[in-house]
């Protein structure tokens, strides 16, 4: 089951958030977003500094799992971060995050002449296409 998705710009601002199957609602969504970004920033820095080998896109951090959720992570070359939170039993969604970026975000946000890079995403076509993509996934509501 997929709980929610976050998209952060390179400066750490959450430019898109949506939840579907999240049972516990946040008291302060803005604070949660800052905590999530800070945790990811620190985790990536720790992994990079403690790894005995050079970290790259294929071998770097892409998910972690607790007893209550799994965090799936993809960072683009332009430092846009895509995060999906799911049930811990959902398989790795890294390829799905890459598709969301390349086939949906790039097509309906980046190529949109009205969109200002780094600002909140409000494009209805993007939101509709993202929802269509996620809701057709076997792990969306299972």
From Swiss-Prot:
It is found in: Golgi apparatus, cis-Golgi network; Endoplasmic reticulum. Keywords: Endoplasmic reticulum, ER-Golgi transport, Golgi apparatus, Transport. One of its GO terms (biological process) is endoplasmic reticulum to Golgi vesicle-mediated transport. Signal peptide: none annotated. InterPro entries: Longin-like_dom_sf, TRAPPC. It comes from the Eukaryota. Coiled coil: none annotated. SMART domains: Sybindin (SM01399). The keyword DNA damage does not apply. One of its GO terms (cellular component) is endoplasmic reticulum. The keyword Transport applies. It holds the Pfam family Sybindin. Its main location: Golgi. Belongs to the TRAPP small subunits family. BET5 subfamily. Part of the multisubunit TRAPP (transport protein particle) complex. May play a role in vesicular transport from endoplasmic reticulum to Golgi. This is Trafficking protein particle complex subunit 1. The gene is trappc1-1.
